[in-house]
Swiss-Prot record:
Keywords, comma-separated and alphabetical: Chloroplast, Membrane, NAD, NADP, Plastid, Plastoquinone, Quinone, Thylakoid, Translocase, Transmembrane, Transmembrane helix, Transport
Gene Ontology molecular function: any one: oxidoreductase activity, acting on NAD(P)H, quinone or similar compound as acceptor
Protein name as it appears in the record: NAD(P)H-quinone oxidoreductase subunit 4L, chloroplastic
The keyword NAD appears for this protein: yes
Coiled coil residues, start to end: none
Species name: Angiopteris evecta (Mule's foot fern)
Transmembrane segments: 1-21, 29-49, 63-83
Amino acid sequence: MIENALILGAYLFCIGFYGLITSRNMIRALMCLELIFNAVNINFVTFSNYFDTQERKGEIFSISVIAIAAAEAAIGLSIILIIYRNRKSTRIDQFNLLKW
């Protein structure tokens, strides 16, 4: 059981990491980042159930990561919306907002 959950977590992490590196769209990159967070949450819960069955530290930490990821997604989508309104594009390679 633990092997299947860890393989699923590693598979989701690799898909998210590959998508984050190769993505040229900001929304797709944000979705891949959320996929990475979910893979990490699966590993937290799996290791918590395997090593410490009495205390639920992994589940509590996983819930806090979900809350932080939801806030990150809301802020990220609002920033993407503002950039889209100004530049009419969400492609990452077209932006040089940090350059003078």
